[in-house]
Amino acid sequence: MLNKMKPGGVVKIFLFLLLFVPSLLAQEYKVIHIKGDVKFRSNTSETWTELKGGQVLNLDEFISTGVKASVQIENLGNIIIIEELSAVSIASIKKMSTDELLLALAMEDMINVPKSDGKGKGNSGSTAVYGEKEGTEINTELNSDDFGIKRLNGAIQLAKNDLMGSSIIFAKETYRKYPNTKQIASYRIFFADVLYEKGLYEEALGEYIETQKLELSEEQRTNLNNRINDIDKLLLNH
């Protein structure tokens, strides 16, 4: 898919990887407090292991919190709190500039180009089904295999820790790996709102328009229409 991008876009992404990844590798993620059931695993393992206080986590690891559980992780002098029923990758716990976010969004768009199955249809991957969720509070009635929803909860935790860019990208990755989580309007609205708050109005507008196609409550539909009208006015004045 790189051959479909303009050369300048490829260069920008290469420079992003060259400059950003080494600084990320130099960071340390240390567990400083654990409450309740918190586990971790690497990307290459299906086995979850109990997390210990004082443990230093690797970039390729995930953490997952149980009901009424939480974990505090120290990184570069900052404390990141991940609350209950959430899952995040350690690599996603990072600050992103607006330029880094835009490049990461471009990379996600490239990855998300549907693969043809030879019959003119894209392959959607996962067939897991998730129900609608009201609001953006943590759902405490998850099944043990609802890892896609736990990841979206984790993305919300990133946003609550002021890691807005990482929150958006982690949510996008989750939608790609667990496609049916995209049908849950409350999450889509939450992350579109994050884009709006970041001042990325065109990107937010695209998300709001896509979310309009989902099953919405009257309140959600009204709020979406109002936000779309607000963005239209903002873009018209620029």
Name what the model sees in each region.
Residues 131-151, 176-180:
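TPR-adjacent "capping" and linker segments in tetratricopeptide-repeat scaffold/adaptor proteins
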